[in-house]
Amino acid sequence: TNRMGSLLMILTVVFLFSCHPKPVDPVDPLPSWNETDIKRQLTDYIGVKAAQIPEEDRIAVFDMDGTIACETPLWFEIAVAIQGMIEQVEKDPSLAKLTEYQYARKLSVNPTDTTVLNHWVVNGVNYLDSIIMKSFDQTDHEEYIRYARNYLTTTEAPKYGMVYGDLFYQPMLELLEYLEANKFQIYLVCRLLLEKKKSICPQTIGFDRQHLLGTCQALSPVYPKDKEASFIIQKSIYQPKNDGDGKNKNIYTRLGKVPVMAVGNTTGDFGMFHLVSTSKYPHLAMMINHDDGEREYIYEPYHGTAVPNWQDSLRINNWIQADMSKEFKTVWKNKN
């Protein structure tokens, strides 16, 4: 009888355990990130600390080039502008003698040509700005957006074997999705001309125009009687340029609030980092460091004037440094 009782007890325990649902492993919100302290800081901030922030104040700002999309050797804006310059020369060969058109031709042949990349400014003339401003001068704004979208989604980028439109970092796209799932409002804020972001972001990563902040090229309105108004691109920009503190001016003017999270990849994003660091809510600032020469490129996190003490700034302000080589398990959206 004792043996029967023991057997019944064992069977009861086995039955109860078999009926009890097994714990389900939580879904990893950042599967393309390696298991590091950086990933733990991100999941702790977004999954835990963000609960202390009212939903209407959960605002995150991201740079674009070099932060969520590749910018080396050519970023989206300059790739499209170069093609525009080449097509102008085909229509008017006399333009070929001008320096900015010569630069565009050189980069179309060799995107890493240092005779161009290291000499944008000559005798006080910024030929990078010249290429960008002249490439689609007097073009209808919406027509340009369609042109740029077609070019970026059909033209293969150097080195990667993918079209430009696929050169988004998979880990960063996961981070954007994770933030959205936790009720964050996200804005892309970079020095890139706003028109370039409008051409690729809505269809590629699902960001509508209302969430894009960039340098605004001047537009001249035209009001035809038989169709909707059009806006013609001019060779100038509306100030301030969306870089450094210009980003913060545009963020505050547009949003009217201080964000709680900022992510960038150059010292030009330090302004955004300083801004979020003043928030009364839990906040986070992170720099993506390009140190992976095998899967992408290695380059310093500044443009123009060297900033050798950039890591000191990160350390002093408790900003995060995310090294691509260590943090990204996978780099590209559609390719390992």
Regions found by a protein language model. Name each.
Residues 11, 56-60, 183:
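A generic hydrophobic-helix recognition signal that picks specific residues
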Residues 22-29, 33, 41-43, 47, ...:
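C-terminal cap/substrate-recognition subdomain and adjoining C-terminal extension
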Residues 74, 79-165, 170:
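A metal-dependent, Asp-based hydrolase signature
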Residues 18-64, 72, 79, 86, ...:
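Non-catalytic pre-domain segments flanking phosphatase-related domains
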Residues 7-16:
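Bacterial N-terminal signal peptides
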Residues 71-74, 79-82, 199-200, 275:
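Short, solvent-exposed loop/turn and secondary-structure capping segments
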Residues 1-7:
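Bacterial N-terminal signal peptides that target proteins for export
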